[in-house]
Amino acid sequence: MVGRNLHIGDRVYAPWNRERLFPARITFLANGTAYFAYQDGETDRMPARRLQPSNKVFLIESVSRKPTEKYWSEGRLLGEFLRMIGARPLYSFIRTKLELGHFLRLARLSTSRHIHLSMHGLQRKLVLQLEEVDVDEVISLAGDLRGKTVFSSSCLTGNDAFGEAFVRGTGADAFISPRREIRWADAALVSQLFYKKLFCDGVTAYVAYRYVRNMYPKHADLRFFKP
């Protein structure tokens, strides 16, 4: 880690020619100055203190019933927990592949480093409310996720066929998911514990993953994949 919670390779939003905000990547930090590169090839610099990555978490959920005041879900419960600890959850309930692609794109362009997927899963698929999405389709919808950590509570997606393909295809910094079937109650518990370690204790995603796995080895059986 360099700077104040900034990493080389972080995706940030930075002004260019004082006109607009453009997505950029930190390339080097020195003497309190951040150097960054835009997608169109332009480069710029500015004080690192103006380029703080957000504590946003993109929460994308798809279950059989849309959460309400009387019906709670893992994703909605996680969102309330994140607010309690000072993070900024961006919750979206989806039903279709098209909606999944839309919100993955928003997450990809965001300064957020974290994406959370709350839905059913199979060996090589995410199961949405109205359709199933194969891992290859998920990769195509997600695009370039370098600099992002993706936590999935979807059953069975922590197997090699899904996890290794996902990080290889998207370039995500990490993909964390249960290898076996997991109850929603356990999914809610381990996801909250993971983000508590991440945001409150300031540890890395891998350290948070190891902590959760050691605490609940049988209930979660989480796997950690990286490129």
Task: Give, region by region, the residue ranges found by the protein language model.
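Mixed-charge, Lys/Arg-rich low-complexity intrinsically disordered regions
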Residues: 1-8
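Basic/aromatic-rich interaction segments and small domains that mediate binding to polyanionic partners
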Residues: 11, 15-47
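A domain-level signal for caspase-like cysteine endopeptidase catalytic cores
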Residues: 52-114, 152-153
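Caspase-like cysteine protease fold
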Residues: 53, 57, 131-142, 200-227
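Short acidic, S/G/P-rich loop/turn micro-motifs used as interaction or catalytic elements
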Residues: 64-69, 97-99, 121-125, 156-159, ...
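Active-site microenvironments of hydrolase-like enzyme catalytic domains
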Residues: 113-126, 169-174
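Catalytic cores of nucleophile-dependent amide-cleaving enzymes
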Residues: 128-191
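Active-site proximal helix-loop segment of RNase H-like, two-metal nucleases, encompassing DDE(D)
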Residues: 189-202
